[in-house]
């Protein structure tokens, strides 16, 4: 079991990584944690907002919207096993120095995303909350929301009801299988979605805090077009927004633009 002693959550996954900080410092090497979009660019947005727009940030809502349509009744835009486990797990958010746990998909909000439109979004636990709670001074609450369409949720509920999202091994014809891994094998490969996906993604952070004694709120976000991403690199925008920041992070390490011995989150 992984606990997060630094911020008081049993849900955190960063402790085992942060524990290597001293070893990496002594070895003179750098580890960069979470260099995708979320986590990754969302951490950059947070550091940028604090540096340029706020004296202190009190609230962060991280929003991940995929407004794309791949034409399948049900498919996931990245590893189905990870995606389905993430959605079916209990949610959590950080508020006033401690973690608040929620039931899966319990908290729902609507948001009008620029260039995408109005979407339903649901609160999930996400790992960047763990580091931002430590690294953004003055923070009072951090939440993460991801959009899901009703068709996706209906299919997922049906699969859950018949046991197909279970990670508990079962015996089938003399062999042990994990239902969720079997489901992954029969679903469309996320890598195959690129040429058939249309629409846009919108991923960003709503920041509320103070500047010169006055409260202000801003939304810093990125929009990617699935079809344009496919033209450029041969993948849909979900893979694009994950892979391009990872490449940039690696490039900045290799060129010594980022050169600090130890283990660090991107913000």
Segments predicted by a language model, with ranges:
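Short catalytic-loop micro-motif centered on adjacent basic/acidic residues
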Residues: 9-10, 31-34, 61
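Short low-complexity, flexible loop/linker segments enriched in glycine and/or proline
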Residues: 19-25, 47-49, 158-159
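Rossmann-fold NAD(P)-binding glycine/threonine-rich loop
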Residues: 10, 14-30
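Short, surface-exposed connector motifs at secondary-structure boundaries
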Residues: 27-31, 257-260
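Single conserved hydrophobic/aromatic residue that forms the stacking wall/gate
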Residues: 1-8, 13
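C-terminal catalytic/substrate-binding lobe primarily of soluble NAD(P)-dependent oxidoreductases
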Residues: 52-267
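Active-site capping/gating segments
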Residues: 33-41
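Active-site-proximal alpha-helical scaffold in enzymes
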Residues: 42-54
């Amino acid at each position: 079991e992984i606990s997060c002693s630094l911020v008081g959550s049993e849900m955190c996954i960063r402790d085992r990584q942060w524990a290597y900080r001293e070893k990496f410092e002594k070895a003179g090497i750098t580890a960069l944690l979470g260099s995708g979009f979320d986590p990754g660019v969302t951490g950059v947005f947070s550091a940028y907002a604090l540096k340029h727009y706020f004296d202190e940030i009190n609230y962060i809502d991280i929003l991940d919207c995929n407004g794309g349509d791949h034409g399948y009744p049900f498919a996931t835009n990245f590893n189905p096993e990870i995606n389905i486990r993430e959605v079916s797990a209990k949610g959590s958010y950080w508020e006033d120095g401690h973690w608040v746990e929620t039931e899966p998909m319990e908290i729902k909000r609507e948001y009008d995303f620029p260039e995408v439109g109005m979407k339903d979004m649901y609160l999930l636990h996400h790992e960047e909350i763990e580091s931002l709670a430590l690294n953004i001074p003055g923070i009072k609450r951090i939440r993460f929301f991801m959009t899901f369409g009703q068709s996706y949720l209906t299919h997922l509920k049906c699969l859950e009801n018949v046991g197909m999202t279970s990670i508990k091994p079962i015996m089938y014809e003399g062999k042990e299988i994990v239902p969720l891994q079997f489901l992954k094998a029969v679903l469309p490969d996320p890598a195959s979605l690129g040429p058939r996906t249309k629409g846009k993604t919108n991923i960003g952070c709503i920041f509320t805090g103070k500047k010169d004694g006055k409260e202000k709120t801003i939304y810093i976000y990125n929009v990617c077009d699935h079809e344009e991403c496919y033209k450029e690199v041969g993948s849909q925008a979900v893979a694009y927004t994950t892979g391009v920041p990872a490449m940039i992070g690696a490039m900045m390490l290799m060129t010594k633009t980022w050169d600090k011995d130890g283990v660090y989150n991107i913000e």
